[in-house]
Amino acid sequence: MSAPVLLIDIGNTRLKWAWCNAGEVAVQEPGRLPTPWQHSGAVTHTDDSAMNTLAAVLRNLRGEGPVPSVWITNVAGPVIAGQVDAALNAAFGDGASVQWVRSAAAHGSLVSGYREPTQLGVDRWVGSIGAHRWLPGETLLIVTAGTATTLDIVTAQPGGQGRFEGGLILPGLALMLAALARNTAQLPALDVEDTGTAAASRLPWADNTHDAIAAGCLAAQAGAIERTWRTLSERGPTRCLLSGGARHALAGALAVPFEMHDNLVLLGLHAMATA
């Protein structure tokens, strides 16, 4: 990289970003996913001051150096896209080269098996690119625990190729908890952070309403992951990768082996930017 690279993942709730210094080479431990950036952060994009904060941080990171190339995924719509464009202009002027990534039928050695490849959520596609880039030749169950929880399947193909097979989408843990509180008369409202006791319990049920809600929502999430993992594992070795803002809450509830990564979408953007 002759110039820095800025990676931006605009999700439904938060904007996550990572800054890769020019000339830095990603180092991977054998069989593990790297985190090939030197600075990273996140803002809640519904916060009125979020874009000003982002612009100030990026301006400081650049300093007197060259303008970065920018790679972005966005699932939050055109309004936030315009706000991010304005923040980038505030940080770098109009000199930044910005790539708004879209889903496609293939990228490198990964082929999309989606019925309509361009209709696949770009976050799911790019996250799969990132995982496959560093774990070629492996069948992967990629779990992203965010506003929605997505399960995406990449199967190993001959010659190190990969195929995105499809996946599942279900309400995220926070959405499940909020739906119960909103649509019932007497059940309390819980946050994702309130599920820790249920996740640590040796029993899959609870003796109080608070923990019963947490245990039920965790069981729904974990059950989808474990069922999919078992189905894939019947065909051959499968690695489960867990990412997203609620990954730590889900981690305590899973009964299958998994590996965590901070942000697979940013990892996929890095793979595309450095291809």
Curated annotation (Swiss-Prot):
Enzyme class label: transferase
Binding site for substrate: 114, 121-124, 209
Top-level lineage group: Bacteria
Cofactor annotation comment: A monovalent cation. Ammonium or potassium.
Positions of ATP binding: 9-16, 147
Active-site residues, as the UniProt record annotates them: 123
NCBIfam families, per database record: baf, PRK13328.1-3
Protein name: Type III pantothenate kinase
